[in-house]
Amino acid sequence: MKGRIYCIGVGPGDAELMTLKAVRIIKECDVIAYPIKDEQADTSVAFNIARQAVPDIAAKDLLPIFSPMVRDRNTIQETHERAAKQISSLLDEGLKVAYLTLGDPMIYCTYTSLAKLLSENGYETEYVSGVTSFCAAAARLGIPIADRDETLTILPGVYDVSALKHPGRHVIMKSAGKMHQVKDELRALGKDAMAVENCGMQDEKIYRSISEIPDDAGYFTVILPSGK
């Protein structure tokens, strides 16, 4: 009998934001998989968050999955195919595998492509929702993301700056390396912005105006522009 693969959102950084279901399933799983950026690494941000909520996780069988932060499609495909083979072999043994991911698994999650490969080979994924970084950031700032009949647009960096002109509220994610451009575009539109870097983590930083946001703000920075 085939095992089961779960993709579990561990939230943005604060282990207390992990859901009861996430904690339960992690405890029940035989193998804990998680993405790493460096092939030499043996842990990750997602794993360290989960370990705070489930200390015994380190005693389980661990499977670091190399997931380089690159845009080359061939490299990405090769790493996903290798990971799919590793996970498939475990599922064929009847094991339960938990794949940990930051935030929620249905928002900009690298596992999506891996899940497709597994599905093509007859392995279906069960997803466990987690708190998104932008919801957690809004809570830390004490401001609603959207209210009443406002629309909400989520942008990965500023790949299409014209989207900032759309009516309603906006959330800007993954802007590392483009922060100066993002701020210039917001200023050109007459918008101020708040932001949270590394929300819920030990090195969390809160910026309450666009002038406070540094150009070198990290990858895990969520920007919430003001105005409509």
Walk through the language-model features, giving the residues of each:
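Class I S-adenosyl-L-methionine
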Residues: 1-15, 20-123, 211-214, 221-222, ...
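A short, acidic, amphipathic alpha-helical segment used as a generic capping/interface helix at domain edges
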Residues: 86-88, 156-164, 177-181
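Structural signal for conserved beta-strand scaffold positions within catalytic alpha/beta enzyme cores
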Residues: 34, 61-66, 127, 147, ...
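A contiguous loop/helix-start segment that scaffolds small-molecule binding in enzyme catalytic cores
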Residues: 5, 36, 164-228
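Short, surface-exposed amphipathic charged segments that create phosphate/polyanion-binding patches used
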Residues: 75-83, 140-143, 165-169, 207-212
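A short acidic, often aromatic-flanked loop/helix-cap motif at beta-alpha or helix-coil junctions
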Residues: 67-73, 160-162, 201-204
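Short gly/pro/ser/thr-enriched loop/turn and capping motifs at secondary-structure boundaries
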Residues: 39-41, 132-135, 201-203
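Class I SAM-dependent methyltransferase SAM-binding "motif I" and its flanking Rossmann-like core
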Residues: 106-166, 214
